[in-house]
């Protein structure tokens, strides 16, 4: 039974790698089209938080959704932005500390909305920040075996946001936590 469980986990991991590689290859081709529309980012983030509630609870991590914006409507490809939020929240939980928090926050910045995903997890060393969004790059290769993932999530986030003419930013301190942030245009 133990062998079957390991095999099943390996198959799931391979499926995730293939799916992530497919996403990356589509993002890098001219075939990639954004379906830009106005949508409620707060509702979308609530759905993402709900999807991770059980995983966060199992790891004793509290999820918080904080809206400090006067509006909730942004312009973007809703499905792609959902993938961005899923990847960032998932990483925040995976690299979080027992009893820690993951916060998804929204701020008004003139014609844009600033979206932040912050945690009080293990943090990232400054010398790793430049390579963080490269395919398959893992900050702590020894620890990442236990954590799982494909090493493609942040590369996907970067490509999606670049296709929205936006950037992903990161601030991090080892043993203090990380904050990933990006802008989306507000809907009029």
Locate the predicted segments by residue.
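Conserved catalytic submotifs in the C-terminal HATPase_c
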Residues: 35-40, 57, 62-72
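Conserved glycine-rich
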Residues: 165-166
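Short helix-loop "hinge" at the ATP-lid/N-box region of the Bergerat-fold HATPase_c
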Residues: 92-93
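Short alpha-helical segment of the dimerization/phosphotransfer core of two-component systems
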Residues: 9-14
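Short beta-strand/loop element within the Bergerat-fold HATPase_c
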Residues: 99-111
């Amino acid at each position: 039974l133990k062998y079957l469980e390991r095999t099943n986990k390996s198959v799931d991991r391979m499926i995730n790698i293939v799916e992530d590689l497919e996403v990356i290859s589509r993002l890098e081709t001219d075939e990639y089209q954004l379906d830009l529309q106005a949508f409620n980012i707060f509702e979308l983030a609530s759905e993402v938080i709900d999807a991770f509630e059980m995983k966060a609870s199992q790891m004793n991590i509290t999820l918080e959704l904080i809206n400090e914006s006067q509006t909730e409507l942004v312009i973007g490809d809703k499905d792609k932005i959902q993938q961005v939020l899923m990847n960032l929240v998932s990483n925040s939980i995976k690299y979080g500390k027992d009893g820690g928090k993951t916060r998804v926050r929204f701020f008004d910045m003139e014609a844009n909305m600033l979206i932040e995903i912050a945690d009080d997890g293990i943090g990232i060393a400054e010398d790793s920040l430049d390579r963080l969004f490269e395919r398959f790059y893992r900050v702590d290769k020894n620890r990442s075996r236990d954590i799982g993932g494909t090493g493609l999530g942040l590369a996907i986030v970067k490509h999606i946001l670049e296709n929205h003419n936006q950037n992903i930013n990161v601030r991090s301190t080892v043993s203090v936590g990380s904050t990933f942030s990006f802008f989306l245009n507000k809907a009029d």
